[in-house]
């Protein structure tokens, strides 16, 4: 698993093309040949860009679900709804299909935000609202999520 780092602001053109920021492109260089999967986020009004290797790992996990359990089948259908294989073109751009532009309410300004091993693509205004929102106290969230983690190998502080 490659860890991706950084948050970058970009412009999207009228055709839905976004120039991938150079530092991000360098981090994803090993994935450029294999391509990427672009999908709707489950929890947020943004898109998720998976390097193909990460997507294949996710699909291996999902493939273990019993499809004769209705809940599993419904999840698979919704999780993969609108999924697109995308590539970085010769000019370093990603084409965001119109249905996904609509889902994420992308206008002119977008944010590429690293999320461990994938990249979230947000409309800039929605991104700002999400990280600055008063609906979540980040200190409380950090304590709830990471407060009881006891990682003896790597020493999470």
What residue ranges belong to the model's regions?
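Flexible "stalk/tail and boundary" regions
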Residues: 1-9, 14-17, 24-91, 99-157
């Amino acid at each position: 698993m490659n860890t991706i780092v950084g948050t970058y602001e970009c412009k999207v053109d009228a055709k839905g093309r976004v120039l991938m920021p150079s530092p991000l492109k360098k981090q994803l260089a090993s994935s450029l040949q294999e391509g990427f999967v672009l999908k709707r986020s489950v929890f947020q009004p943004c898109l998720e860009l998976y390097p193909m290797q990460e997507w294949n790992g996710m699909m291996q996990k999902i493939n273990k679900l019993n499809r004769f359990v209705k809940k599993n089948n419904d999840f698979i259908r919704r999780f993969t709804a609108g999924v697109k294989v995308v590539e970085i073109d010769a000019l370093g751009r990603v084409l965001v299909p119109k249905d996904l532009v609509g889902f994420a309410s992308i206008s002119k300004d977008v944010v590429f935000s690293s999320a461990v091993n994938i990249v979230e693509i947000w409309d800039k205004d929605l991104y700002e609202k999400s990280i600055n929102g008063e609906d979540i106290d980040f200190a409380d969230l950090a304590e709830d999520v990471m407060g009881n983690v006891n990682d003896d190998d790597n020493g999470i502080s």
